[in-house]
Amino acid sequence: KNFDLSFQMTGQFGFKILNEPRAYYENNSIAYNRLKSVQKAPYGGQYTLSTAQKQTFVSYYLEDGDFLKMTNITLGYNIPLKSSKFVKNIRAYVSADNLFCITGYDGLDPEMSNGDIWSLGIDWRDKYPSTRSFTFGLNVSF
């Protein structure tokens, strides 16, 4: 009876993302820090270390970017008060941001961008994932 719930979801559908971190770390021309998935190379199964960087254009690293995110959810409780001269209302709440993301994308976050409008649809490496945060609060009205 005294509870309230609000949530916000965001999503995008029908687009592709270039998974640049996978393309970089699965590159068989570098000898360091390679992913095990390099064994599934898109270049005809060449698993050996090569000194020449492959300049072939392939769609191997294009992935479906569809996602649905729980951007925010808040659950609150209005604490019933007996008549008080000073306090009119007290509400306690808990809130979560970026609680979950439903996606088939292999990267960190299908919504990531480096802020450059010319590189939309490219997930650049060396990015931090979106933070997940939890907030507990108390609203008091006088």
Positions of the model-derived regions?
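Transmembrane beta-strands of outer-membrane beta-barrel proteins
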Residues: 5-7, 90-94, 136
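Extracytoplasmic gating/loop element in the C-terminal half of outer-membrane beta-barrel translocons
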Residues: 12-91, 95-99
